[in-house]
A protein has these predicted regions:
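Transmembrane helical elements of multi-pass membrane transporters/channels
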Residues: 35-50, 176, 197-200, 204, ...
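Interhelical loop/hinge segments that connect adjacent transmembrane helices in multipass membrane
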Residues: 10-28, 32, 167, 210-255, ...
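Membrane-interface junctions at transmembrane-helix termini in multi-pass inner-membrane proteins
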Residues: 29, 90-99, 149-172, 190, ...
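Signature of the first transmembrane helix
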Residues: 2-19, 27-87, 108-124, 141-146, ...
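Alpha-helical transmembrane segments of multi-pass membrane transport and lipid-handling proteins
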Residues: 2-18, 44-48, 107-132, 137-138, ...
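Membrane-proximal transmembrane or re-entrant/amphipathic helices at the cytosolic face
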Residues: 1-25, 422-426, 430-432, 451-528
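Membrane-interface helix-loop junctions in multi-pass transport and translocation proteins
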Residues: 56-73, 129, 137, 164-167, ...
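Specific pore-lining/lateral-gate transmembrane helices of multi-pass inner-membrane transport
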Residues: 93-109, 268-384
Length: 528
């Protein structure tokens, strides 16, 4: 099932009365890597089922169905991010968590979610009128039922994250994904149209809530009091503002697009955006987990923050640029073979959006880094830059439909990325040129890969374009070209990424020490 992917509320790694003692670092690293292997395996199985069903459902449903769902999920996704007032981060990260505080947070979350549900019941007709689409009233009211269920999963989910217990949680996620996908498949085949996506989303929420409570008994009687919570509420406010700004940066495109060009054209854009952006969440989580110890050591010595940030950027660039430029290079084949003829209008948006996804992935990883070194206000100010800039670009781009909206991403976001990196310079000690140097060789190798795939498609007889073997052959050509190019351009970076991935899968230990910068990479620290 392909619905709007909301930002998962991973608590920021801020260290205010939080976290383990320094002597526990080795144990935590081991637990994180073991837990993440569980997560990787379960997510692989779950996503295999999910993507198979998703592609099948896309072929059945219409662009209009996906456009309606995209319109409805814009306000739902926003309040999903805000439904705990940031206090879920307190549950995970506060070192001394009393039963009274847990009960108080639970009470606040219950009240807040009930208020959100009531607000949606009343405002659904107004939202539908804004989009000039009466069918949205019923869709939004049904989707709002999630806010009755969400409070019940807050405590068990936070406890599992607090204990870094990804193993049991990954089982719940696997069951949830499979059940939601099967529900979507059943409803799509029965001709439910957009309600396939609506009820699929509700099914996913309900099963996840039930599963989390079965494996982690954390519920308690709520306490409806704010006494002694001033510090926690201020921390939650910072997390909430951060999430709201990220939403304004990344999700106002659908809000504006739905108003300007209606549900059918928005459906093409929404599917293209979801196909391009869904891997961002998976790859970001993987690389962040590998770089986690580097973040923990970011302030351990001179240049530590700089080294950690450059290591993270280098590892992400090695995977992100070939992956997403590869999607862009074969977007026509993806549309034809996997989505079907009625989705041809999604081809160009998919090509354009894929080009900018590596930068979005790097920006997403910058936020936990800044929280990890104790500067959440810098993270907020960085996302404020994008939250003010990107909606203006979307307003201009929406005049030319889905392609214009995609161009707004492709042209404006690189500028936002560079400005944001420059803004973070005083904290990280990393110049914009430092970041660009870590990205330079993966970008060059990826562009060469793009050119080779383009040439093979257009100038070499390489099978029939409507056959899956043709697509597989193009993927193979691209992979061989990129790997070969990187072995020539930067063999050391390839070795580093290989060791990190082998450590992740338990093949051998990995020191997590950033490789020494070569004289070609080295530049003076900012402010030195």
């Amino acid at each position: 099932m392909l619905t709007r992917k909301t930002h998962r509320k991973h608590p920021p790694s801020v260290r205010v009365e939080t976290g383990p003692a320094a002597g526990d670092d080795v144990d935590i690293r081991t637990r994180v890597l073991i837990a993440l292997r569980w997560t990787a395996m379960s997510k692989f199985l779950g996503q295999l089922v999910s993507w198979t069903v998703t592609l099948y459902v896309i072929r059945i449903l219409s662009p209009e169905d996906y456009g309606l769902m995209a319109m409805a999920t814009v306000p739902i996704a926003l309040f999903y991010l805000l439904n705990t007032a940031g206090l879920d981060a307190v549950l995970v990260q506060k070192r001394e968590l009393s039963d009274q505080l847990r009960a108080q947070i639970f009470g606040i979350v219950i009240v807040l979610n009930l208020l959100i549900f009531i607000v949606f019941l009343g405002t659904a007709p107004w939202i539908a009128a804004f989009y000039r689409e009466p069918r949205l009233t019923a869709i939004i009211r049904i989707l709002a039922l999630q806010f009755i269920l969400l409070p019940v999963e807050t405590l068990p989910q936070a406890q599992l994250e607090r204990e870094i217990n990804f193993g049991r949680r990954s089982i719940v996620e696997l069951v949830t994904i499979v059940a939601g996908s099967l529900m979507a498949l059943t409803l799509a085949r029965a001709g439910f149209g957009v309600w396939t996506l609506v009820w699929g989303s509700l099914t996913t929420t309900a099963i996840r809530m039930a599963g989390l409570n079965l494996i982690q008994r954390s519920l308690c009687w709520p306490r409806f009091s704010l006494g002694g919570m001033k510090t926690d509420l201020l921390f939650g406010r910072a997390a909430t503002v951060d999430r709201a700004l990220r939403f304004a940066l990344a999700d106002t495109d659908r809000f504006i697009g739905g108003r300007f060009f209606g549900n059918t054209l928005l459906g093409y854009y929404a599917v293209a955006n979801d196909l391009a952006s869904l891997p961002v969440n998976k790859l970001t989580g993987l690389i962040n987990s590998i770089a986690l110890p580097a973040f923990a050591r970011a302030q351990s010595g001179p240049g530590g923050a700089r080294a950690a940030l450059l290591t993270m950027t280098r590892l992400m660039s090695l995977l992100a640029f070939p992956f997403f430029l590869g999607i862009s290079s074969i977007a026509p084949e993806i549309s034809t073979l996997l989505l079907g003829p009625k989705w041809q209008a999604a081809t160009v948006p998919l090509q354009l959006l894929s080009l900018v996804m590596p930068l979005r992935m790097l920006m997403n990883a910058l936020q936990p880094f800044l929280w990890g070194v104790g500067r959440p206000e810098t993270s907020v100010s960085i996302f404020l830059i994008g939250a003010l800039s990107m909606p203006l670009a979307f307003l201009v781009g929406a005049q030319w439909g889905p392609v214009g909206l995609s161009l707004a991403w492709a042209l404006a976001y690189p500028v936002v990325f560079l400005v944001s990196i420059a803004h973070a310079r005083t904290l990280s000690g990393v110049l914009v040129t430092d970041i660009l140097r870590t990205m330079e060789r993966p970008i060059l190798a990826s562009l060469l890969m793009y050119a080779v795939v383009f040439a093979v498609k257009h100038y070499v007889a390489f099978g029939q374009s409507e056959h899956i073997l043709h697509l597989a052959s193009l993927v193979l050509v691209g992979a061989v070209t990129y790997i070969g190019s990187m072995l020539v351009l930067d063999r050391g970076a390839c070795r580093e990424s290989s060791e990190a991935l082998r450590a992740f899968f338990g093949v051998r230990p990995y020191s997590y020490d950033p490789r020494p910068l070569s004289k070609n990479d080295e530049t003076p620290l900012a402010g030195h």
